[in-house]
Amino acid sequence: MQNITDSWFVQGMIKATSDAWLKGWDERNGGNLTLRLDETDIAPFAANFHEKPRYIALSQPMPLLANTPFIVTGSGKFFRNVQLDPAANLGVVKIDSDGAGYHILWGLTHDAVPTSELPAHFLSHCERIKATHGKDRVIMHCHATNLIALTYVLENNTALITRKLWEGSTECLVVFPGGVGILPWMVPGTDEIGQATAQEMQKHSLVLWPFHGVFGSGPTLDETFGLIDTAEKSAEVLVKIYSMGGMKQTITREELVALGKRFGVTPLASAVALY
């Protein structure tokens, strides 16, 4: 009999959460991660499912996600412990046929529940499904240190944050040409911040929560982790630049345009036109 803990999706979640903790992005129970699956992914492991799956209603219906399974991190769970006990810290859930709630099919033992940011995740999944024609499957939230630091010293608007991150490392424009969305500070774990994040996810694969963290979206766990890692590396460079007195020279507007043409991407117009 196949064991679900050996599946590609459980093993992928173990690696992503462990790597994020080692990066210092997910202290204590900080951060959350969800991966949209297909029925064919989970069907071989039905023997591992709970005999009586718990049902939890959603705070608002998600009809676009009806009958869709996900693997999610748990509320109050530490990323560093996922590798030690996947079943206690992760869960496979499946949205019901009307999108009004979900059943916990596997994991989240001892009456654990999914991440408190589940509304933000599911709303963002809905928008990324539409924006990418179903390609994006992952939503990752973490407390990337240098990205958080920048929200204290840069004006919190999409064009400026995007432009500075593009200048911090040449690869950034290629990796996230659509730029980085940013919210005002909001109370986490609410439908309101979930809706605001999802609205930005219509246009951007990265969304900053000032003084808190970042949301990233991508087609795979590796791609999503790499997206955040790339932005965080640029933010680290910028933090060092500002601590050394600021930029003396940088990548110019003309060079950014040339970079986009070379790699066949269309950079966010407002960031290109900023100066």
From Swiss-Prot:
GO terms for biological process: pentose catabolic process; rhamnose catabolic process. Zn(2+) binds at residues 141, 143, 212. It is found in: Cytoplasm. It catalyses: L-rhamnulose 1-phosphate = (S)-lactaldehyde + dihydroxyacetone phosphate. InterPro entries: Aldolase_class_II_sugar_metab (IPR050197), Aldolase_II/adducin_N (IPR001303), Aldolase_II/adducin_N_sf (IPR036409), Rhamnulose-1-P_Aldolase (IPR013447). GO terms for cellular component: cytosol. This is Rhamnulose-1-phosphate aldolase. Binds 1 zinc ion per subunit. GO terms for molecular function: metal ion binding; rhamnulose-1-phosphate aldolase activity. Its cofactor is Zn(2+). It comes from Salmonella paratyphi B (strain ATCC BAA-1250 / SPB7). The active site is at 117. Its main location: cytoplasm. The keyword rRNA-binding does not apply. Pathway: Carbohydrate degradation; L-rhamnose degradation; glycerone phosphate from L-rhamnose: step 3/3. Keywords: Cytoplasm, Lyase, Metal-binding, Rhamnose metabolism, Zinc.
